[in-house]
Regions:
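Beta-lactamase-like hydrolase cores
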Residues: 26-70, 95, 130, 135-138
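Conserved serine DD-peptidase/penicillin-binding transpeptidase domain
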Residues: 31-39, 88-360, 466, 473-477
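Small-residue-rich helix-loop
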Residues: 62-64, 316, 326-478
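Residue-level preference for non-acidic, small/hydrophobic
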Residues: 59, 78-85, 148, 180, ...
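N-terminal secretory signal peptides that target proteins for export/translocation
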Residues: 1-5
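Bacterial N-terminal signal peptides
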Residues: 10-22
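Short active-site loop at a secondary-structure junction
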Residues: 64-84
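A short glycine/serine-rich beta->alpha loop
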Residues: 65-71, 257-258, 369-372
Length: 478
């Protein structure tokens, strides 16, 4: 064979080998024009966007853009936390909250104290706390002559101001983790217009001991614009809420969730208030302390299965639940030690290394929820994580926990064709992103990660929607 054809064949062989590498599949592909146009309208440069698009079955990369660059993922960090939890604990795993009745019970009276020990359950909401106290009453207790003692020792974390992240301490997404987290340390105000009385009734849940909130606010005419601002509520003390403004009739019924302004005492006020509402009497007080270590609990309250918790974390991007899970993973690894943030970070990075290899600078773990300015992850690493999940025994559980575009959760307002993608969203002031699975017209399934880090990030949402729509149309296969 002449030398020139041999050299040509050798070159073709080299190209074939190189094209087996992920980069080769995307070297000639640019961003879709509709995505570029949407970025331009948002005044966001292409350099602010990272993308990794893979075929879910083969793992073949069909579009990559700065995929190895570590960027702030915002709530996409929850994918790492929830995937690790499903892998390490399993979808049916539950938290256990033990309860002790320390003392004899005679004629409806507990001659001693009631102890409740937290283990990180993120779903100890008012309804489940009611069930816990109802169980106490079913054991014959109507009056407690001692104290109700709350044990938070399973987590060893520093107290902090809920407003530290963004100055919005009254927003529930800023609530801090707690081994005994009750009702997300938040209250809910429901406003119900009563046209005949010319007021909106204010309903407060849950009942808190010592709480005094205005039970009504005057109705006003006009549109329902900034209805929260129109109330002119003083949020400095949520246990003594007063409204100096009005509520527009046009708003109909609305709900306003608020983080309690005194989280350190919230549990005590909630348990005392709920116990009293249930007809119980308490001669002592509700206080923090240590549960008995040498006796078996009188009973235990089981949480919903992990799958339900993961679904709520991912569908609705619940930060405090994600942080509870993050710390729980460390606690389960070393159950004889209180979980710390440092231990939780180490545990999560160890899991990523075991399952995906050493991430290096492509992963910076902070608090498990993504509510952070310091967290970092690459689009490549998130895509590999989603491929791992796709081929795992818990594939269906993780995928079903993600918002469905145009249907539910944080994706209900997506502009892409509804019902064809399961995608976790990530949003901060300067971050916008999605990560998950997209089903195309032909039935192909793609793994998609797209993140924008820029001051105008949220204006780039239409560009991300356009990228999702492009994948749905099988454009990557053309």
């Amino acid at each position: 064979m002449p030398a020139r054809p041999r050299r040509w064949l050798a070159l073709c062989g080299l190209i074939a080998v190189l094209c087996g590498l992920p980069l080769c599949a995307t070297a000639a592909r640019a961003l879709p024009p509709e995505v570029v146009a949407a970025l331009q309208r948002a005044r966001v440069p292409e350099q602010a966007l990272v993308v990794q698009l893979l075929e879910a079955g083969s793992g073949r990369s069909v579009l990559s853009l700065r995929e190895q660059e570590a960027v702030n993922p915002a709530s996409l960090a929850k994918l790492v936390t929830t995937a690790a939890a499903l892998d390490q604990l399993g979808p049916a795993w539950t938290w256990t909250t033990p309860v002790w009745l320390q003392g004899p019970v005679r004629d409806g009276v507990l001659d001693g104290s009631l102890y409740i020990k937290g283990s990180g359950d993120p779903k100890l909401v008012m309804e489940r706390l009611w069930l816990l106290l109802r169980r106490v009453q079913q054991l014959g207790v109507r009056e407690i002559r001692g104290d109700i003692v709350l044990d938070h020792s399973a987590f060893a974390i520093q107290e902090g101001d809920a407003a530290d992240f963004d100055g919005e301490g009254h927003r529930p997404y800023n609530v801090r983790a707690d081994a005994l987290l009750l009702n997300y340390k938040s209250i809910s105000l429901s406003f119900v217009p009563d046209a005949a009385a010319r007021v909106a009734r204010v309903l407060v849940e849950p009942p808190l001991a010592g709480s005094r909130v205005d039970h009504s606010v005057p109705l006003s005419a006009g549109p329902c614009d900034d209805w929260r601002g129109s109330l002119k509520a003083n949020l400095a003390d949520t246990s003594q809420l007063r409204f100096a403004g009005s509520y527009a009739t046009a708003c109909g019924e609305r709900i306003w969730p608020l983080a309690d302004s005194a989280p350190a005492t919230f549990n005590a006020r909630l348990i005392e208030g709920l116990w009293q509402e249930m007809g119980g009497q308490l001669r002592g007080r509700v206080r923090d302390g240590t549960a008995p270590a040498d006796t078996r609990p009188s009973f235990e309250l089981q949480s919903p299965p992990l799958l339900e918790v993961v679904r709520e974390i991912n569908k609705f991007s619940n930060n405090v639940m994600a942080q509870q899970l993050f710390l729980t993973l460390a606690l389960q690894r070393e159950p004889d030690r209180p979980a710390t943030v440092a231990a939780a970070r180490s545990n999560l990075r160890r899991w990523v290394t075991e399952r995906l290899g050493e991430p290096g600078a492509e992963l910076v773990v902070t608090n498990g929820s993504g509510l952070s300015r310091e967290g970092r992850v690459s689009a490549r690493l998130l895509a590999r994580l989603l491929l791992l999940a796709h081929d795992s025994p818990w594939a269906a559980e993780l995928a079903s926990s993600l918002p469905i575009n145009g249907v539910d959760g944080t994706l209900r307002r997506s502009r892409a064709t509804p019902g064809r993608a399961h995608l976790k969203t990530g949003s901060l002031r300067d971050v916008a992103g999605v990560a998950g699975y997209v089903l195309s017209d032909s039935g192909r399934r793609y793994v998609l990660v797209a993140i924008v880090n820029h001051a105008q990030a949220n204006a780039a949402r239409p560009a991300i929607d356009a990228l999702v729509q492009w994948a749905m149309r099988d454009a990557p296969a053309r």
